[in-house]
């Protein structure tokens, strides 16, 4: 079937898409309508923790679909209880609210912090966030984000999100006032170019929050569920946040997100928060399968080995091609180029024949890598070899 035969104009235009339609995937590979295969190092923007069509997920979906799909969030269901127990047992948090997307989880975190401020801080409502941060595409989460141009895109913004600079504690301190209720950040700023927070900054934020009696919120939508080398990124900084959000990797490809909080922060009253599909057993059962897979003995050790392979490979490529190095945490990494040709490299990689390569360029001079956590050593080596060839070809 030719691409022109697909009625793509029935879809609303929200982004520039190439002229291909993906029809199947397995592991680290996708196949389009013409039968061409692509090595996928985007994985739905760090969503597909176990790659495409993971057998553990397919099994969980089939088994749960045969039992119960959605009885309504007004009732308990077993998979949501099991997943909540797993998440709280593996973290510093006490309670979980399930949602469908990272934006929804972050919106919930904002609402919870503001409710806590009303109860405990005389109505304090401001949440300090970071320039260049990304928290979602609802009006409130866009306002909380620090992406250039977003302050006017759907103006007026939701008020109450002063912006500090990541890894600059003084910039945060200068913004704290009587109306401040929390500080919120990504442990690694993904859209900004894979910029990790430093240990000193994260610990400084915890100390500042304690000194001023405000909340410390970590947005782990992209960094959570093993992506950065530990189950949750905050665990590598030796800090205890008050609130954490998860999405992307927790569902491994299905719509699932979570808002986690410590007991003393859980101030929602009945009716304050909810959602038609939230915590439905079908998605929660997949979440349990993903959690059990990545916490099984040996899984994270294998992912850490692939992290070393990717980091060392990117460093070698950087030295060979005169680039500016690599950075990141775990299997969320970036190759920093010496010029703004990242979009051209992404395009050329996708056009490779007979098999393409899918990459992401959040900045003109930067490539981002978000493979499945169970990517094989052979596929990692293949990607590095393909990337070297593409860079050479683009720069001839």
Swiss-Prot record:
Annotated positions binding pyridoxal 5'-phosphate? 102-103, 134, 219-222, 276
GO molecular-function annotation terms?
Answer: identical protein binding; N2-acetyl-L-ornithine:2-oxoglutarate 5-aminotransferase activity; pyridoxal phosphate binding
Q: Where does N(2)-acetyl-L-ornithine bind?
A: 137
What this protein needs as a cofactor is: pyridoxal 5'-phosphate
Q: Per its UniProt entry, which superkingdom is the organism in?
A: Bacteria
GO biological process terms, semicolon-separated: L-arginine biosynthetic process
Per the UniProt entry, the Enzyme Commission number(s) are 2.6.1.11
* Quaternary structure, from the entry: Homodimer.
UniProt miscellaneous comment: May also have succinyldiaminopimelate aminotransferase activity, thus carrying out the corresponding step in lysine biosynthesis.
Stored HAMAP family: ArgD_aminotrans_3 (MF_01107)
Which family, according to UniProt? Answer: Belongs to the class-III pyridoxal-phosphate-dependent aminotransferase family. ArgD subfamily.
Q: What is this protein called?
A: Acetylornithine aminotransferase 2
